[in-house]
């Protein structure tokens, strides 16, 4: 009996070792999956980024059904890069990109953020060369920003 209890205890302690670690949040996965199903066309204007983008009703604000929100709250540069394919496949007319502030809150270096934004820009330019890209500045922050943990 003692051996069975020890065996079960050992198995229970080992379970976390086998659990697959998630790369992104459930919210990210839900939004990214939704965006894969929503078509992008060459007439579209895409707002791409994090919660600042996610939190606005862009089509209503501009009264234009071709304006599409592709923001995900909490997103980081590599999150945007990982979900670019359905966007560039549609070869949109314009992309407004605002990303990087959540990388700052996670302690990512400025050089790494610049490198990852450059990867995003290169992919857009290579796969959708006629798309006009509007790169928006990462918002300035002070030392207390880390307390928000975007």
Indicate residue ranges for each PLM-predicted region.
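Bacterial Sec-dependent N-terminal signal peptides
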Residues: 1-21
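Serine-esterase "nucleophile elbow" of acetyl-processing enzymes
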Residues: 19-94
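Short coil/turn segments at secondary-structure boundaries
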Residues: 3, 71, 108-111
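Alpha-helical cap/lid subdomain in secreted, periplasmic
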Residues: 60-62, 66, 82-150
């Amino acid at each position: 009996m003692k051996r069975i209890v020890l065996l079960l205890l050992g198995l229970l302690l080992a379970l976390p070792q086998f659990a697959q670690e998630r790369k992104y949040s459930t919210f990210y996965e839900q939004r990214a999956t939704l965006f894969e199903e929503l078509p992008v066309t060459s007439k579209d204007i895409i707002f791409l980024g994090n919660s600042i983008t996610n939190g606005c009703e862009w089509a209503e604000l501009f009264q234009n059904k071709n304006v599409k929100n592709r923001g995900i709250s909490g997103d980081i540069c590599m999150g945007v890069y990982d979900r670019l394919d359905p966007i560039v496949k549609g070869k949109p007319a314009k992309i407004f990109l605002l990303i990087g502030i959540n990388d700052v809150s996670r302690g990512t270096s400025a050089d790494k953020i610049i490198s990852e934004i450059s990867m995003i820009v290169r992919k857009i330019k290579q796969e959708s060369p006629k798309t006009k890209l509007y790169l928006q500045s990462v918002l300035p922050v002070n030392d207390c920003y880390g307390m928000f943990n975007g």
